[in-house]
Structures are given as structure tokens and as C-alpha cells.
Regions:
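Short hydrophobic beta-strand element within catalytic cores of glycosyltransferases
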Residues: 260, 274, 279, 283-286
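A charged, aromatic-enriched C-terminal amphipathic alpha-helix characteristic of glycosyltransferases
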Residues: 171, 248, 308, 322-352
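Conserved donor-binding/catalytic core segment of Leloir-type glycosyltransferases
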Residues: 139, 163, 167-171, 176-194, ...
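Glycosyltransferase donor-sugar binding loop
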Residues: 187, 191, 212-226, 240-244
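Nucleotide-activated donor-binding/catalytic signature segment of Leloir-type glycosyltransferases, i.e.
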Residues: 226-252
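Aromatic "clamp/platform" in nucleotide-sugar-dependent glycosyltransferases that forms part
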Residues: 266
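Donor nucleotide-sugar binding/catalytic pocket of nucleotide-sugar-dependent glycosyltransferases
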Residues: 108-111, 128-172
Length: 353
């Protein structure tokens, strides 16, 4: 991303360990990082049983060896025991956890695809056992994720709790809907799991209402979605923005009317896109998957069955629009998903526990 964020005075950001896949492979192969460990895990994980698993394992091993050989990593790993190591994802950099020594706290936050192996190809996540054996605190973005971990990884000795993510307070848009049009917004990658085309299918079942649907996000299915817009009824206007920056997303909320936010994904963790929507006091219609029911309640919107029909979504769009004054989404955001409250609380918790 080209967006830059300000840093506190006591924060140091190291340069990337590698800047290209070629540099990664070279550094991962031609270094003095341990080899025997990775050969042993290749056998114990049976990563040789399929081509996908083998390729995934080799790529992961090369990445780990590249990181372990980095001079900045080595320096950090030698620092005092009174240190806290925090990984934002349970995959990727977290794979080096077994090699981090003399640290007081090793903390990993888990989301969705880094937690649920059944969402990964061949249900395979490398070094799963080693990551859970090495951490001493696991943080989950949803209560649903926390319960999943307790059930599936309860044999490992670590403390666990749920700490919601959050979004910044940008206020509430002063743009009012005065044109009688139902303004629908959705925001996701256009990929199969997000089922964006089902939104269009549902909107076509509301012929007697003027509707403007804006979808924010690109992806592999973007061109195919565009093709479906060739012949739209007169009452329906569709705007596909493609991929845009988060600043532009916030700008859309601030400068355009939005009546309903829609998310019909087949699988979710706990969507930040919904957090943003309810922060602007916009009611949500979303599928009851993952931890979505922790943010879409009777106060903030309506939940759909994961296997909803297009007609069901169409009916709910009309109902929520006609009764949107009954919803108070921002109240829920203030209580549970305000970054200004959640992140200081999280930092205090991980430092003081």
C-alpha cells in the first residue's frame, strides 16, 4: 500500500527483510539457518503426501530461514527477557515462534484463515503445532474464534481471550438521503467466497424501488461482475469502484448517502468493513457466518441464513430501508468496536497480564 501512517516517537520500523521473491529464495537457501529442523518437520507433518502441501511447506521453510538469518531479527532475539513479542497473524511471520528465545511474552492474534485449517487448501497450515506450543498468549478477534481454539487446541498451554478489533471514529455523515433512492453499499474483494453477484441478483428482484448500489473492491471476479451489468432495469444504478484506498472508502461514507451496508460472504472472521459501516450509524444486512453475529445484532441490523435465497435478501433490503430508524448501529460500535477504546485496552492487557 502507498498509504503512510504516523509513528510514535518510541517506535522503530526496520526495513523489509526481502523486497522480492527472488531475494527471498536466495536468502532463504544460501544462509546458515538450521536445516535439520525443517527436514524433521517435513517428515512429521507429512508435507510430502501432496504436491500442494510439499510446495507450501518448502516455501514456508525458505521464508523462515530467510528471516532467521536477518541481522535485525538476530539482534532482537538477543535482547532482554523482559520483552513482549506480538504477531498480528497466526501465519507468516508467526512461523518463527519456535526460534524466538528469552522472551517474557509471546503473543499471537488469530483472525480467520490463519485459524481455521478447513478454510485452507488441503486443510493444511504449516507449523500449526509448533506455533501453539511456542506462544503463551493467544488473542482472537471474535468469541467464535476463541471457542474454536479452546475446542481444537486446548491441549496446548496458553492463555486465551477475545479482543475485538476496531475502527477510528470519523463521525457520522451529514449527507442525508432526500432523493427517495435506496442507497446500498458493499465492500469486499470480488472473489467466490464473497458472493457479490448474489447482491445484484437480489436487487433485480426489487423492480418497484429506485436503487443505487455501490460496490467497493476488486478481485478476480471483477470483470465477470461488470459483464453482468450490461442490461440493467431502469430503476437500478450500479457503480463498481474497483480497489480503492481506505481513505477513499471513508470519503465515500462522509460524502455520499448510504442507507444499508450488505455483506453476503459465505465465510468470515469478524468483518472490519462492518465495523466501519456501523461507526457511521448505517444498518447492516449480513450472513450469519463466523463471528458476524457478534457485530450484527437486532440493534445494528439483520442476519441472513448462510444459505439465503435472493428473494430473502431482497425482502430484507426493503424492510430495513423502511424501518431503518429502528436501528442504532453506532451505539454497538461505541460499546464494542471503537478503536480509540479497544486498542489502548488491548495494549494495557498484554503488557500488564
Amino acid at each position: 500500500t502507498q498509504e503512510q501512517r504516523s509513528l510514535p516517537a518510541n517506535c522503530i520500523v526496520f526495513p523489509p527483510i526481502f523486497r522480492s521473491s527472488g531475494e527471498l529464495v536466495f536468502k532463504g537457501l544460501f544462509c546458515f539457518s538450521p536445516l535439520f529442523y525443517f527436514f524433521k518437520k517435513l517428515i512429521s507433518e507429512k508435507a510430502y503426501t501432496s504436491l500442494y502441501k510439499f510446495k507450501k511447506y518448502i516455501a514456508t521453510a525458505i521464508t523462515c530461514r530467510c528471516i532467521l538469518a536477518d541481522k535485525n531479527f538476530k539482534r532482537l532475539n538477543r535482547q532482554s527477557t523482559e520483552s513482549t513479542v506480538y504477531f498480528y497473524w497466526g501465519i507468516g511471520m508467526a512461523y518463527i515462534l519456535p526460534f524466538i528465545h528469552n522472551k517474557d511474552k509471546k503473543i499471537v492474534r488469530f483472525h480467520r484463515t490463519d485459524l481455521y485449517a478447513d478454510l485452507r487448501p488441503h486443510q493444511y497450515i504449516p507449523f500449526r503445532k509448533e506455533v501453539f506450543e511456542s506462544l503463551n498468549k493467544a488473542v482472537f478477534i471474535s468469541k467464535q474464534g476463541l471457542e474454536y481454539a479452546k475446542k481444537n487446541f486446548g491441549q496446548y498451554k496458553f492463555s486465551a481471550y477475545c479482543s475485538y478489533l476496531g475502527t477510528k471514529d470519523h463521525g457520522i455523515s451529514k449527507i442525508k438521503n432526500e432523493d427517495g433512492v435506496i442507497h446500498i453499499l458493499s465492500c469486499s474483494n470480488v472473489v467466490p467466497v464473497k458472493r457479490v453477484s448474489l447482491i445484484l441478483k437480489s436487487l433485480l428482484l426489487i423492480p418497484d424501488r429506485p436503487i443505487q448500489w455501490t460496490h467497493i473492491g476488486g478481485g478476480k471476479g471483477f470483470n465477470a461482475l461488470q459483464q453482468q451489468l450490461q442490461q440493467l432495469p431502469a430503476n437500478l444504478t450500479v457503480h463498481l469502484t474497483g480497489a480503492i484506498t481506505n481513505r477513499e472508502v471513508i470519503g465515500h461514507y462522509l460524502h455520499h448517502p448510504v442507507d444499508i451496508f450488505v455483506n453476503v460472504s459465505a465465510s468470515e472472521g469478524l468483518p472490519v468493513s462492518i465495523m466501519e459501516a456501523i461507526s457511521f450509524n448505517i444498518p447492516v444486512i449480513a450472513t450469519n457466518v463466523g463471528g458476524t453475529n457478534e457485530i450484527v445484532t437486532s440493534e445494528s441490523g439483520v442476519l441472513l441464513d448462510p444459505h439465503f435465497s435472493a428473494q430473502e435478501l431482497a425482502d430484507q433490503i426493503v424492510r430495513v430501508y423502511e424501518h431503518k430508524d429502528r436501528f442504532h448501529p453506532r451505539r454497538l460500535w461505541e460499546e464494542k468496536f471503537n478503536a480509540g477504546k479497544n486498542y489502548p485496552r488491548f495494549i494495557s492487557q498484554i503488557l500488564n497480564d
